[in-house]
């Protein structure tokens, strides 16, 4: 799992970064959060090998976004969410590893 909070990137830039990581490492889960003033975007990308292990970007992004008071969804390989509570981004990122770990354990 690669995860980071970035500043000032729009949703398109987040998607591009996630796609590049996913294409380079099919066993990887990438969770990127970009804060912009009073809102944030959360992007999750899951490579093919990671999907084969039961991981789903749509499910991951929903759970991560809930920690930050946001909502989102998407496909098994890529999903996005948004939140207006930028004060909880660190909590969301910290929860991400546990969320992925729980999905692998199921």
Question: Where does each model-flagged region fall?
Answer:
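Glycine-rich, acidic loop segments that terminate in or are immediately followed by a histidine
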Residues: 2-106
């Amino acid at each position: 799992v690669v995860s980071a909070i970035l500043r000032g990137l729009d949703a398109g830039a987040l998607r591009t970064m996630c796609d590049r990581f996913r294409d380079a490492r099919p066993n990887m889960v990438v969770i990127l959060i970009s804060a912009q003033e009073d809102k944030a975007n959360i992007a999750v990308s899951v490579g093919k090998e990671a999907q084969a292990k039961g991981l789903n970007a749509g499910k991951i992004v929903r759970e991560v976004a809930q920690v930050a008071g946001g909502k989102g969804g998407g496909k098994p390989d890529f999903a996005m969410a948004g939140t207006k509570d930028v004060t909880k981004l660190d909590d969301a990122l910290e929860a991400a590893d546990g969320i992925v770990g729980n999905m692998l354990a199921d």
